[in-house]
């Protein structure tokens, strides 16, 4: 946990930098959700370890901001001297306009994307607040034992799985480079998103614990050459076709030397890199952002096969969990170890796709709760346990949530669970026309919960990368999901309901956006396969169509995964699965 003396040291750094306040984002130069330990500056300063957030340190106070997923976590983790607020109810800019008018705000220009900087700058100017780029990071200056940045080898991603060769992707990117210019075609493109870099080159990396990224910047030339800035040794084991590797220290000079027109994505390009480019800049979303979101037929097949592999691990885990709970108390931290153990039996398993979220009882109400050794609890009996986990496999990525009964929970929990299931089924069975946006599907999903007077404070669904980030843009199913949902996308379906201090419920499967030829509409094909806990379902609250969907889903598990379970020769496991997927009726 952060020490109050860190705040005092940061305030000394404010004076040395000549600014009145410091902005500390939870992010790195690549603006990713997961960052290496060397970039966990917000956690070092405040104690808060959530995957999204921002801190503001002034001489008078220190304020921590994150979204509704982390409200409870902020309160429990923040160090002495910090206050906290939940976005969007309280936005950092609004707080600054109330408390910090006519003052300066220092920031690290490598840690703020250009688009975010401009939005903040425009709003803060109305209150006379000046954003000041700093030539060093004040948190780094007071972090003597800061971990070293990762330097781990990259590896090739199977082109047979990708469905497109590196050269085919480079050609598509070059063709798209001219689409955003009505005059001169760009001569180069800055690649500032590691997901784009990995997708483009058909490579993956080990720089992060849960996301197979290579953390590096690159430049794609109009001639089809990709220059990557990083340690040579990291790229020694990957295909060198169309690839040049330069030391990271050369990035700034090479950007300054670019001629003609350069395409940059303002949502990921750091302010510091944009500043050094002297050539004319065209700003547009990197075309690969949508390209990689629309999975190729090969990638879709890989997702289906990988989810069958993951289903075996999940079924074995759920069986183990039930059996173990009957024999002895189970701690939350045991869950993560068990899931990794079962998934590791697959030869192509790489790592978890995120830190497992396992909350028993009231901890389940903390949307992104993470159990830590020595700080976790025994999972309570006669309650609920929310388990959100996933795996990175060499072919694809999984993300699945199951909420399970731990004994005989109160009827109110089963009632809430059934309403969440109804919301899940509403999205899973939806048909919608081309042009439908994520916000429209979000409302469709929430409608059954709203009818019951229920709501949840997170998005309904996010994109998922192919052995890339478990949270992938550009589309989402959420109240802010203004992007169109298009065929080929892999998205999550994860409505929930949470009662602070008592329990949390979430049911999550991944779905593939496909065409429904019978209605000329789009539809969602569920690809995650693991039993939904029928001990928590009140069939009387469900329609015939909802019961039919559940029974058909469980029948699929029996057909597709049942033979793989039976092949293990474990009669007890087989019997457990058969009971878990037995048809229900009123």
What are these regions (language model features)?
Residues 1-586:
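Active-site neighborhoods and metal-handling regions in enzymes and metal-associated proteins
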